[in-house]
Each structure stands twice: as C-alpha cells, then as structure tokens.
Amino acid sequence: MENDAELISEVAAGRSENTPHQAAFWKVSGSFLSKVLGFVRDILVAKIFGATYVVDVAQLVENVLLNVVSFVTSPISIPLVPELTHARLQSQRDYRSLLSSVFGLFSIVGLILFTAVAVFPRLFVVLFSGGFKGAVLAYAEYTYRWMAALSVIIVVSATIKTALAVKKDFVLLSFSDVLMNMVVISGLLFGTRQMELPILKTGAQLASALALWVYFAIREKWFILPRYGHWDPRVKSLLKQAGPLFIGSATNMLLTLIDRTMASFLPEGSIASLAYAQKIFGLPLGVWAVQISESSYPYIVSAFATSDVGKGYQLARGAIQRILFLIVPAMTGLLLLAPSIVRIIYQRGAFTEANTALVARVLQGYMGLLLFSSVQFIETRLFYARRNTMTPMFVCLAGLGMNVALNYLLGFVLHLGAYGLAIASSIAAFASMTGMYLVYRHMYGAVDYTLIFRDVLKIGGGTLVMAAVILGLQSRVHILPLIAVGFASYVIATALLHEDEAMGYLKIGRRLLARVARRNL
C-alpha cells in the first residue's frame, strides 16, 4: 500500500490536484453558473425566435444527438475512472495507452453517428420528429446536417473530462459548459438568426471541446489522439463493466416512460404536473447532489486503488455529509413552500391556481426521492470504485419493479393520482437506498456512517430552526426574501452548532472578505 501511495505521489508530482472540498466547490459553482447562463440564453432565444418551430427543431436535434452519444459514452466513462486510476499506478505509458484506446472507441461511435446524420438527416427526422412537415421538415434536415458534428465533438469532451477527473483537476472541467453558454449568448447578441442558430450551437460545443483538449495537452505535455489499432487489452474489461450500466441507463429511461404512460390514464394535467415538479426539485439535485457525487468519485477510487479502504470510506461519509448539508434544508423548504414556489415560477397565463395546487402536491410527494437518491449517488459509486457495476444494476432493476407496483397501488387503487406516482417514486428510492446499503455491507463490510451521525443531527437542528423561521414569517414576507432569510437562519444555526460543513464555508467566506479588504487598502 505504501508503494502504491508513493507511486501516486510521483505521478502527481508537479501537478496541481484539487482537494475534495475544492473539487466540490468548482463542480457546484460551475454547474450553478452554467444554469444561470442557460437561463439567460433561453431568455434571449425566446426574445429572438419566440415559441416557434426554430426553437423546437434546434432543441430537439441537440437533445437527440447529446442523448444518443451520452447513452454510449456515459456508462463507459464511469468504470473508466477506476481503470485509468489503476493504470496510472502502473505507469504513465499504461495510462496513456488506455486513455487513447478509449478515445478511439468513443470517436468510432461519434464518426458513425456523424456519417449517419449527415448523409441521412431525414431518417432521424422521421425517427424522432415524425410530425414535422413542409418548411419545418426542411429546417429540421438542415439543422441535423449542421449539428451532426456534435456527435464527434461530444466524445472529445467526454474523454477529456474523464481524464481531468482522474487527475483531480476540476476547474476547466467544471466551467466548460459555462464557456459554451457564453459563446451562444454572444452569438445571439451579435445577431444570430434562424439559419445561423444550428451553426452557433455547434460552434459553442466545439469551442468548449477545444478549450478542454488544448488545456489537457498543455497540462500533460501530450496531445491526446484516438488510437484505432492495437487497443489496450483493458478495454475489454472496461466494456464488461459498462454492460450493466447500459442496462441501468435503459432502466432509468424505461421508468420515465412508464411513469408518463401510467400518468396518461390519470386526469388531465397529470403528465405535465410530474414534469413541472421534476424541473423544480431537479435544481438542487443536479446542481448540488450530482456534482458532489461526481467530484468525490475520483478520490474514493484513488483510495481504493491504493488499498486504503478506510480513507475511501472517510471520503464517502464526507461526501454524504456535504450533500445532506444542502439537500435536507432544500427538501424541507420545498415541503413548506411548495405552493408559493410553484406559483411564482409557473402561475401566469393559462396556468391556474388549480394547476399550482396539483404541481405543488406532486412536488411534495417527490421530496423523498430528492433525499434518498442523493445519498444513493454515493452508495453506487462505492460499488463502482470496486469495479462492481453488476450489483447496483440488480438493485436498480428491483427498484424499477417496486416503483411500477407502487405506481399502480397508490395512483390507481388508492386514487391518489399523480401525487401517488410521486410518493411511489419516493418509497422506491428509499427501498433502493436501503437495499444498496445492506448489500454493500454484506459484501464488503460496514462504511461506519454512524461517524457522521452527530453532524447529521446538527444539520437536522439547523433545519428545524429554518422551518420555524419560515412558518413564523410565511404570511408576512414575500417568497424570495423568505427563502433568503430561511437559508441564512439555517447557516447561522448550523454554524452555532459547530457543524463541520457550515464552519468550513464560514472560513472560506472570511478568507474572501479578508482578501477583498487587503485589496481595498
């Protein structure tokens, strides 16, 4: 183990690696800023193009290409992190051999899709948007041809992002989407119109991918190129590990389809209420929980690669504590303020008070899903760090079966409608989280989550203070300042309780204020 640790130190010598806290900070900051810029981008698109077929086509084509490529690259990228980490322990040559081989595999997928889209755009229009006719059909074919290059561009980004994650360098990795949105916003401000929009979107993705590729080349003193012959033998092992993840991805898509299909038999507005609610709770889930789980994963893998299991468990516990620090108050705030939040976001025009009540109730039903799936992100990565992708797949399949059964029971037998489907998802998420914990404990031993129990209690105490403040001021204060005051009370309460995460953020705040003060002197 000591020799492995020395090897990692030698490999990392002279390289700047982020700490787990820094990695989480960069990932969350980049994701949040990207969301904000994405909102600005959408406002500009709406102002210039309105709700026309131009926007419909551009969004649909981009989503189709992103999803098709990501369906292949994402399941491979997850086990690629431990494989690359182990390769680094062997030698830099092994690391580069595996990375360039995977780049070759990814690029083949991208080139095949690029050729198919560029040569047969109408086939993709028929497959994914059969309702397009006339001028809309012609514009869709034009857009597919121009955006076909995304198939190759995305695999470049996916390869470099995985490599940077293994190197624990999260700065540009986290802000590449920010750069992409800035390019799109700049193009819109400088007069991009209907025929230039697909070119602008493709160019923005290209700028982001090139920035990643050049940065990686400068950092590593190595211009990575795809390898097409004599692939690294570990690619076979990688594909075997990726197999269950392909099934898991398909399972998640299938569950979404089943939810929507079952909701179609419920009263009008049920499908829409599920979608609207998911967009709201998806913000803390995507900006916080997903980013922290992704940023912590390479560190857990590195600990396991050097047989330092205790360190890996410590990192996993820290990641869960960091996730709970925001997810618990976010869940509580959404439970208490769901009607007001839905009202301020959606209630205008044809969206009535009755719609607000339905979406708010569904949103409250999803709160268990928000909490339990956030914790499960770390649990699954403990399996992945051990190169075990099969077990999480079986737990996922069991969760799918339970979710469908609960959908029928709560949504139809007990007549809870869309709210019942949301509750079913929360119960199934709790069962999956618990099952993942029990199976891991049986296979590998305890992770000692009780070591963070005291801090979790402090998070709960701060959340109770926040809830009391919200309930006390809810009838007298507007929703936006109420959210700010409630969250401030939570941070102060957890800091007074000396909760680790709160104290860490206060230290960061004091350092930033001190730097500003020194500059002003």
Write out the residue ranges for each language-model feature.
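Membrane-proximal transmembrane or re-entrant/amphipathic helices at the cytosolic face
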Residues: 2-10, 471-521
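Alpha-helical transmembrane segments of multi-pass membrane proteins
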Residues: 132-160, 186, 351-379
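Helix-loop junctions and terminal segments of transmembrane helices
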Residues: 74-90, 289-308, 320, 379-380
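Interfacial/gating helices of multi-pass transporter permease domains
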Residues: 46-67, 139, 237, 263-285, ...
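Transmembrane helical elements of multi-pass membrane transporters/channels
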Residues: 22-46, 201-208, 212-216, 231-302, ...
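Short membrane-interface helical motifs at transmembrane helix boundaries
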Residues: 112-134, 332-352
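Interhelical loop/hinge segments that connect adjacent transmembrane helices in multipass membrane
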Residues: 2-20, 214-252, 310, 442-460
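Membrane-interface helix-loop junctions in multi-pass transport and translocation proteins
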Residues: 171, 179-210, 390, 398-434, ...
